[in-house]
């Protein structure tokens, strides 16, 4: 009888430990402020760019061939400049990230190195927010930390944080996942792409720059010399030097802005909490 009680106690303890378990993934520095992450596919380690503004998770054609996946079809995305990106697809691929296995029904297949300078270290793919569509994650990018939460740890993580005004967007084909943060200005809401991969300045469209009174003639190639502007993010006032550019969004948050806060993203409930 005592043995049974001990076994039941051990099983209960294991379940409690598991319920509080988090998977903390360490991000690695790349060029400028960009981050990479180790992704294992069929036991082999690859170097993926972690990009919250990446829209689609992609693998290189080389990986698809190594794991004998058929490359097929066509998918279309847009860079913030409006440039069209054409890619293909592959199905049924599992990633191991930290201790977490994530199954992808479909991923994009495209060679990211085709748009990067030749001297950049090789990138094998892009890990976008789409990979976490069934999860709750916490991003503390200033400390190079990505946490995959469970239901219990997520409640603890959200505690003390404020809810952000956001939109979750799935792109023109319904196959992407991006987050836009609503930033108020003169009784209107402007929507900024949540883009950790933007290692440059916070960007304003030409139209938004007029609202924030950022004159093109005051800009220099060295944006650090540009004037500061104020952006209200949730209950926080962010003062940062933006740059006006011909882009397809109202604006694009950058690494510098995102690194000032800690974000917990609940994809199922489409909520973003931050502090």
Regions found by a protein language model. Give the residues of each.
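Bacterial Sec-dependent N-terminal signal peptides
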Residues: 1-24
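Pepsin/retropepsin-fold aspartyl endopeptidases
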Residues: 20-275
